[in-house]
Amino acid sequence: ACSSPEVSIFHFFVYAGSFVKNFKKMKGSSAISKREMSRADQCKLLAYTAVGYETVGNVAADIASIEGANLVAAPVAAGGHLGKGLTDAAMIAMDCSSIPFEEIKEILNKEFKEMGRKLDKNTEALEHVSKLVSKTLSTVEKIRVEMREGFKLVIETIENIATKEIVFDINKIVQYFNNERENINSRQKEEFVAKLQEPAPGNFLLYLRNSRTSESGTLYSLLFRIIDQELAIPNNAGDNNAIQALYALFYGTETFISIMFYLVKQYSYLAEYHYQKGNLEEFNTNFDHMKIVFQDFKFSLIGINQNTKPLVDEVLNVLNNVKNKSFIRNVQNKLFYDLMKQTESLLELKKEIANMELPIIDETPRLSISISFKERSDDKPVDTPLLKWDKGKEVKYAIQFEQDGKFSKISSWSKPVTVQHLACPFISVDKDRRNRLIFRQFGDQIPELVGTLRGSQVEFRDIHRDLYNAAQVPYAREALSISRTLIQNGANVSETFELGRGAIHAAASAGNYDVGELLLNKDINLLEKADKNGYTPLHIAADSNKNDFVMFLIGNNADVNVRTKSDLFTPLHLAARRDLTDVTQTLIDITEIDLNAQDKSGFTPLHLSISSTSETAAILIRNTNAVINIKSKVGLTPLHLATLQNNLSVSKLLAGKGAYLNDGDANGMTPLHYAAMTGNLEMVDFLLNQQYININAATKEKKWTPLHLAILFKKNDVAERLLSDENLNIRLETNGGINPLHLASATGNKQLVIELLAKNADVTRLTSKGFSALHLGIIGKNEEIPFFLVEKGANVNDKTNSGVTPLHFAAGLGKANIFRLLLSRGADIKAEDINSQMPIHEAVSNGHLEIVRILIEKDPSLMNVKNIRNEYPFYLAVEKRYKDIFDYFVSKDANVNEVDHNGNTLLHLFSSTGELEVVQFLMQNGANFRLKNNERKTFFDLAIENGRLNIVAFAVEKNKVNLQAAHRGKTILYHAICDSAKYDKIEIVKYFIEKLNESECNPLHEAAAYAHLDLVKYFVQERGINPAEFNEENQASPFCITIHGAPCGYSLDCDTPDRLEVVEYLSDKIPDINGKCDVQENTPITVAIFANKVSILNYLVGIGADPNQQVDGDPPLYIAARQGRFEIVRCLIEVHKVDINTRNKERFTALHAAARNDFMDVVKYLVRQGADVNAKGIDDLRPIDIAGEKAKAYLQSSRFLRSGHSFQSNEIDSFGNTIHGISMSARTNDKLTQQISSKGTRSDSNSTEGKMHSENVHVRSIDVNGALLLLDFMIRVFASKKTNFAPYGSRIKTRSAAEAQAEALIMTERFENLLSGLIGDPIPDSIDFSNVHSKIYKAIMSGRRSVISEMLCSFAEEYSKLNHESIKQLLSEFETLTTTKASEIHIEESVPYAPFEICELKVNSNVSQIK
């Protein structure tokens, strides 16, 4: 069943929906048949997520201390997965076991083997290295696990030929690394080491070390091929090929980092392994390997200086390059967004690696050892033979540095010395700030640590290790005799060696309590002496089953509850775990013993004692008061463990002692749950016979009952036993609404279905996702169940939440008999799911001709029904290349050349999506490849437009297109090359130019016009095209074309960051930035002006282009004004300081040019900026003389033109600013004064537009003082605030009467124009402008300028009558006055009418609209 259903039916039952969606985007529009994925892949995708792995890993650590942990861990991990995972009835029906039991067991076995290989902690000379590397490796592997599915997707869908080859090679390396690593990790310690040390050339570690070299085919070289060839830089938002390459680059880089830390970890392990074995030469060799690998890979990853190309930096540069692409926000590729989430992790790894140093001492000790057997007066000689000290045997020594837990390599051995009649020589070494560890070796025997010199110590006697060795001699008398001799000759009973263990620990391990007594007599503190892991002599004796030594230590008042460091074991934990009954009995007889002490996982000695054959458990249950219901950290009680280990006798003892039968663990799993899951019928029977057992107990989150689990795990005998119990509730549901009938139907258990229905199970009940038992029975393997369910009243038209009916499933799965049954019971053949998918779509998509025939014969109109993606049955048959269904549809008059509303045939559609196999299928079956759509495009055109190189190459190479045929006024080849450049399809461009050696059009011009940087670089760098060249045929240079952009482009405004990037790139290749770049002799500057490219113009000037260089006698400013390029004009004047009155060869200014063409925004701007409105060009023509209608009206309305001349010099106002353009006569002309002072006087212009233009001009004529006063007035009106101009008072110069008169005139005129522009003709008689002028004049002369605002308020009564539009106009005027945007004016919410109250105006309903 799993091998055939189509994705669209199930949507992977919601869980895989997003994966399918993105998979389809990667492949194109084709549907995905489930037959394309293996069952294992489907099940993994649906069920086994990272949640499961995390659960398993945690359980392995928690359970590891239990004897028989492998029996317990898998069910507990499965229970955790059930509690957190994505189990669903539909998944179960597909026979994708919702709990991947075998995978869980496999992972657990690896975890336990890893623990079994773990070397004795704290013997580790490289312990800190191991911790550091393991932590980073774990981080990297987590990222790789998260990215693994995405990388598989890339492998399956990648199309680009160049990228595909590289990615496949990367995949080979990745797969070999993953597989061989798993192979090695699955082995026990000795085999593991042997595998790591295989001789060359098959040595795995050597192979991995080679991956950082630049040799062809290595991982490092492959990653740099992607980088150097820029395969990971997308050209547009739809460039999936580049996104795939980017993903492969990132995943490959993470693998490269993983390889680095894996190598360091394994060389560290090997070094430590040999250190503990005493193979010091091998330790040194692997120490060097570890160090060199770390340094080499670190250099490759992050470099050491600016001259290197470190991999991580290069990858981050690529990522940043991609992120900065302007189109990147339009990318719809899930892989890309997944990748962006991981970018931060790569940055963190880079920092971590950069700051990382191996915690080692990178210095090998210089051998400087003196060995002396000479007798000394203050030390007694020790005669040979003694232990290893035999006459004639050679002995030698070596040194190792240690400081703060860091270790060095070991020095070379000293020259061997032959032992004579004395043992235990004196050893002298050089002084050093670091500790010096001294090793000795007799002949070819294993070296051993004999002492440590600390600080200023330079000498010691090699006798202490001999005491340690003597304490563990198996013969008690001999051990005691030698130990006594050594102690008498100066051996230190407190000296420690490997693991921090001394002679007392050795005696405990061997059970030599006489030696123990001798040692304690010398130093009673040895009684509680702990080694580096916290093991005391009592721990060691208990774990070694040395009961006599245990009793000896207890007799000396040893602490029986002492705990180890990390595991928190007491001696009783160790004895119980190993089922050591005598030691256990000795310990529990002690009054002070803590029977319920919990280790780091929360297990008590009772927990650890329970195994399949434990006798200790019975002792602890019967003979002690141990708490029997105590829980571990994961909530396991002793009864849970007894159930999981199938220990019925202990279970009975626990139940008899009052164990809580219904206690759940952390996930709510009771002992009965575990018994049902594991199929332990005898245990289930025992538990069900207990008085208070809860057969309906549910887990915490998912609410699984024991019956659910028995059915789910197909433990049929257990399920039937549970069904026989009268207390069972068969209608209980999980939190997903799954009841036992759903599970029985899904798993194909007909007998259970029959029994459940006999007990009145509800056949119509739906799960929370809308699945009925009938749905699940159809999906399942047993085809008898649907017939039985239908007979019992199942609804044949039930819909899942996704709208899928049983008929959909039967059609998609090809179950014709069930399909006929459903039809006979009234199933709706036109039922649609949420994607408008009908059963006919499912049948076609999955290749079930028999069902297709049934449906079409029943209703021929089904031939034309479309789903939400506009796919109709014939389309799907073509897409899936099902020849039998295709032929059937053709026999029913389906037309392979039928067109849609856009004129596209199936060949067009599948060419667009790059489905080469489908295109081939269509052509083999009569598709006409010459047909054109409504845009006159063939399948070949669409393949080019969408970058489908595979279709293009097929069409060319199979002669499906005549490249020399006429097409749109040129040849097909011409348009093919130009269009591929236009649409930024670099691979297709390269195909034509490199493979076919064709270059009929000039593709660089197209690439430049559309600002495709990568294509431009390709033509300039690889093809050697000169970007500055132009001629009669190519009338503009590529550089010029880049600046200007496509004639119409994709938008009218092509001034984008992409285009500027291309300009920046090409500007370095241009010999003269001020040179001509087209046949009309334009410069780059003038081209930027014609194209209205402000940012490009700014860039060009910034790199040396001359903003004043004339073209055919016209300066750039004149050209910009002539073209109406307002922003260009403004930029030239304000940013690049071009003279506003610069003239062309006919002495015309920019104002002439703008006025002639009625470009009013430019005209107004130039006037405001002080352009000479009376400038005369050829024939004494002023701007007004050649102006268009609008410009002429505007210029006429300006009172600057009322006198025959303008200022000969500029006046300096009271703030030191120049007042431009004020007519001298305007300040002294009495006639004008009379005119302005007369009541109701209007502007000369009858045009409202003229009035507004005029007053816009005047605002530039008021000096700063006047502008500030008007601003004060406006602020009062609009914000209920008064601007304080006091700071400026001291700088106001005294005015002459003429000056004050002129200023008052200007301000009065300004106020008049403001009002007339706002409220229109006539201005009420109540406003006397001569009076206004008089008061302003007096205020100026008196120096009391602050009263002007109050005075203006008194004349503003008419403002209270403004309507909404007038208010908007007023705001606009205020913007002109102050450069403050009207939208920025804030009106206090609490005082909306305050502005009007200040001027004591009438308030009406319109006033609130000011907001």
UniProtKB/Swiss-Prot annotation:
Entry comment, domain topic: The H8 helix is predicted to insert into membranes and form pores by assembling into tetramers. The helix is contained within a helical bundle domain that undergoes significant conformational changes during pore formation to allow exposure of the H8 transmembrane helix and transition of the toxin from a soluble monomer to a transmembrane tetramer.
Residue stretches of each ANK repeat: 462-495, 499-528, 533-562, 567-597, 601-630, 634-663, 667-697, 702-732, 736-765, 769-798, 802-831, 835-864, 869-898, 902-931, 935-965, 968-999, 1000-1029, 1080-1109, 1112-1142, 1146-1175, 1331-1361
GO molecular function, one term: toxin activity
Tissue: Expressed by the venom gland.
Organism, as annotated: Latrodectus tredecimguttatus
Protein name in UniProt: Alpha-latroinsectotoxin-Lt1a
Keywords, alphabetical: ANK repeat, Cleavage on pair of basic residues, Exocytosis, Membrane, Neurotoxin, Presynaptic neurotoxin, Repeat, Secreted, Target cell membrane, Target membrane, Toxin, Transmembrane
Protein purpose: Insecticidal presynaptic neurotoxin that induces massive neurotransmitter release at insect (but not vertebrate) neuromuscular junctions. Native toxin forms cation-permeable pores (with high permeability to calcium) in lipid membranes locust muscle membrane and artificial lipid bilayers. May bind to insect neurexin-1 homolog, insect adhesion G protein-coupled receptor L1 homolog, and insect receptor-type tyrosine-protein phosphatase S homolog, and induces neurotransmitter exocytosis both by forming tetrameric pores in membranes and signaling via G protein-coupled receptor.
Disordered: annotated span: 1230-1254
Positions with biased composition (Polar residues): 1230-1249
Record note on quaternary structure: Homotetramer in membranes.
GO cellular component, one term: host cell presynaptic membrane
